[in-house]
Amino acid sequence: MDKRIAIVTGANRGIGTEVVRQLAEKKWKVILTARDEAQGRKACEDLAGRGLDVQFHRLDVTDPENIHRLAQDLKADPGRLDVLVNNAGVLMDEDRGSDRITIETLRRTMEANFFGPFQLSQALLPLLNRSDDARIVNVSSGLGQLSDGGGGYPAYSISKAALNMMTVQLAEDLKGRVKVNSVCPGWVRTEMGGPGATRSVEKGAESIVWLATDPMIPNGKFIRDRKEIAW
Ligand SMILES: NC(=O)c1ccc[n+]([C@@H]2O[C@H](COP(=O)([O-])OP(=O)(O)OC[C@H]3O[C@@H](n4cnc5c(N)ncnc54)[C@H](OP(=O)(O)O)[C@@H]3O)[C@@H](O)[C@H]2O)c1
């Protein structure tokens, strides 16, 4: 059987790098993307040095030109994708409530956490359509839950709630072709989560990798620890 092929955004560090590692350990071919070329190549070389099938491609998810170029390059080689992991994300709220958050912060957060994943998903659909088991995994957050969202990070929460609605819309419109789910990794010790977070990156990546690889996953759900949670 052909190797399964995944692409992961924001994979030069944190949960993204770990998702690439876990997928590649399962003998997948993984395209590791990052907006910083040097950091992305370094992460890729570290994994490839362990014998893993990992390739680098530069991608700033907020740059439409980058997205177009990536889609063109992947169309030429490898010509198909099985899984897109929309992992790249920013948290820039700086302790401001929704009464004081600047529109600039809101816009920049939406660009990275919502418009980027949206445009990238659309651009890579032709390649996902060539898979017999295509999936999009949107790395969201409990802070984006409408049912439990008040956590003091308004721009971030709004962007992840929008990402979740993107999951719902795409899951419906692509039914039978691509499974689309949101996932909360939990509170993870990364640059974003900070050193006091309760989870390792290995644990944070677990449900993301499960949604990418398990034969029996749902469609159009919000998942944490392999279980459905409320929107
Ligand atoms: N850590 C947690 O507790 C936690 C909890 C819930 C959800 N999440 C979500 O999990 C995902 C991964 O977060 P993390 O904890 O691994 O955070 P992280 O260590 O801060 O990593 C974020 C990654 O996203 C990349 N990124 C940001 N903007 C980008 C852009 N425009 N284009 C491409 N890449 C971009 C960063 O690249 P640079 O290095 O260039 O900045 C970095 O590689 C995010 O979507 C986050 O919202 C994390």
Residue ranges and their predicted role:
Residues 9, 81-89, 113, 138, ...:
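Rossmann-fold scaffold of SDR-type NAD(P)-dependent oxidoreductases
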Residues 50-53, 73-86, 92-94, 179:
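A glycine-rich helix->loop->beta "capping" turn
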Residues 1-31:
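Canonical Rossmann dinucleotide-binding motif of NAD(H)/NADP(H)-dependent dehydrogenases/reductases
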Residues 37-38, 58-72:
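The beta1-alpha1 cofactor-binding region of Rossmann-like NAD(H)/NADP(H)-dependent oxidoreductases
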Residues 26-42:
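Conserved glycine-rich Rossmann-like NAD(P)H-binding loop of the short-chain dehydrogenase/reductase
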Residues 71, 121, 167, 205-208:
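Short-chain dehydrogenase/reductase
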Residues 175-176, 182-188, 194-231:
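C-terminal helical subdomain
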Residues 90-110, 115-118, 122, 129-176:
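Catalytic loop of short-chain dehydrogenase/reductase
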